[in-house]
Amino acid sequence: MDSIDRLKTYLATYDNLDSALQDANESEERREDKYLQDLFIEDQGDKPTPSYYQEEESSDSDTDYNAEHLTMLSPDERIDKWEEDLPELEKIDDDIPVTFSDWTQPVMKENGGEKSLSLFPPVGLTKVQTDQWRKTIEAVCESSKYWNLSECQIMNSEDRLILKGRIMTPDCSSSIKSQNSIQSSESLSSSHSPGPAPKSRNQLGLWDSKSTEVQLISKRAGVKDMMVKLTDFFGSEEEYYSVCPEGAPDLMGAIIMGLKHKKLFNQARMKYRI
C-alpha cells in the first residue's frame, strides 16, 4: 500500500478528525477578521517600512532630495530651496528677446498697368511659424471682401494689431433708382403706352424655385453643412424684387442676395464656401 492509501486509512480511523477540522476553520476565520480590521485602522504607529519598499524608494532618482533638511525650513524657505535645486534645464526663461536680424519690407511694383505686392517672412522662422505668418496674410486679404481695407483704422494693442472699419453692404439703390426713372418716364408718356415690362424668364424661374433647398458647404471644422431656400430670407415675391429688382443670375446668387438682405452674409462667408 502506498503512502496515499496509508494516509486515507489513518484519517478514516482518526478519532479527533472533526475537532481538528473545526480548529482549522476557526483559525482561518480569525485570520480573515484580523485582516479586515487592519484595513480600517487609521493610525498604526511608526511601523518599520519593509525592506523591499526601502530598496524601491532608494532606487528612485526623484527621492535624492534631502527631505530631512526641508522639514527644518519654513514653507517659504522650502519653496526657495526647492527651486534652487532644480536642474537649470528645467527652468523656463520668459525674458528671452526675439528679434529678426534680417527682414525685408514689403515691395510694391507696377508693370503694364498691373500692381504686385511682395511680402517676405522674417528670416529664421520654422516651417510651422512660416505657415502661421502666411495664414495671417491670407486672413487679411480675405477680410477685404467685407470692408474697404484702405479705410480701416489700425489700432495697436498689447499683443496684437486690430483693424476696425465699416462693413460693406449690398448696394441695390442704383437698380431701384433705375427702375423708378423708367416708371416715371412711362407715366409721362401717352395713355396708349404699354405698362411696365414683364419680369424676365430667368427672374420668374428663380422665384418659382423659392422652396428649393441649396446646400451651403462648411469650410470650418465643427460646423455642419446648412440647407437654405429663398423663403428663409424673403417673405414674398414682392420683397424679393424690392431688394434687387434685377434679380440674380442663378439660385445661389439669389440665396446670397437673401443673406445680404438679412445682414447674414459676412457671418456665412466665415463658415461656408460661398
Curated annotation (Swiss-Prot):
SUPFAM superfamilies: Phosphoprotein oligomerization domain-like. The modification Phosphoserine is found at S59, S61, S236, S242. GO terms for cellular component: host cell cytoplasm; virion component. Residues 49-101 are annotated as: Interaction with the L polymerase. Its main location: virion. The keyword Cell membrane does not apply. Residues 174-193 have a biased composition (Low complexity). It comes from the Viruses. Keywords: Chaperone, Host cytoplasm, Phosphoprotein, Viral RNA replication, Virion. The modification Phosphotyrosine is found at Y14. The record marks K260 as: Interaction with the Nucleoprotein-RNA. Residues 27-36 have a biased composition (Basic and acidic residues). Phosphorylated in the N-terminus by host CK2. Phosphorylation of the phosphoprotein is required for the transcriptional function of the P-L complex. Residues 22-65, 174-204 are annotated as: Disordered. The keyword Transferase does not apply. It is found in: Virion; Host cytoplasm. Residues 1-59 are annotated as: Interaction with N(0). Residues 166-202 are annotated as: Hinge. One of its GO terms (molecular function) is RNA-directed RNA polymerase activity. Residues 254-274 are annotated as: Interaction with the Nucleoprotein-RNA and template-binding. Belongs to the vesiculovirus protein P family. Homodimer. Interacts with the L polymerase; the association of P and L forms the polymerase complex and positions P optimally for encapsidation of newly synthesized genomes with the nucleoprotein. Interacts (via N-terminus) with N(0). Interacts (via C-terminus) with N in ribonucleocapsid (via C-terminus); this interaction allows to package the L polymerase in the virion and positions the polymerase on the template, since P acts as a bridge between N and L. Nonenzymatic cofactor regulating the function and conformation of the RNA polymerase and part of the transcription and replication complex. Binds the viral ribonucleocapsid and positions the L polymerase on the template. Acts as a chaperone for newly synthesized free N protein, so-called N(0). Plays a role in virion assembly. This is Phosphoprotein. It comes from Vesicular stomatitis New Jersey virus (strain Missouri subtype Hazelhurst). The gene is P.
